[in-house]
UniProtKB/Swiss-Prot annotation:
Cysteines engaged in disulfide bonds, as pairs: none
Protein name (database record): UPF0150 protein jhp_0960
Family to which this protein belongs: Belongs to the UPF0150 family.
Pfam families (UniProt xref): HicB_lk_antitox
Record InterPro entries: HicB-like (IPR031807), TA_system_antitoxin (IPR051404), TTHA1013/TTHA0281-like (IPR035069)
Length: 72
């Protein structure tokens, strides 16, 4: 299963979250650590789901698309 996670740099390191897994967040001092940590968080999150919830997620097809906005 391919899941999109967002990893953002902040003043304390890196913050990671999965937009469609409510509450699935993690962090790390480096990008690599945040990536490892969010992967573990996703695995734990999915491990707590029921079979029908997992089936729904496996059918979910989302795209992260960059959108350019003209802002005055």
């Amino acid at each position: 299963m391919l899941i999109n996670a967002v990893i953002e740099k902040d003043e304390n390191g890196y913050f990671a979250f999965v937009p469609f897994l409510k509450g699935c967040v993690s962090q790390g001092k480096s990008y690599e650590e945040a990536l490892r940590n969010i992967k573990e968080a996703i695995e734990l999150y999915l491990g707590d789901l029921e079979a029908d919830e997992l089936a729904f997620l496996s059918k979910k097809n989302s795209v992260i698309a960059p959108i350019e906005i003209a802002f005055a």
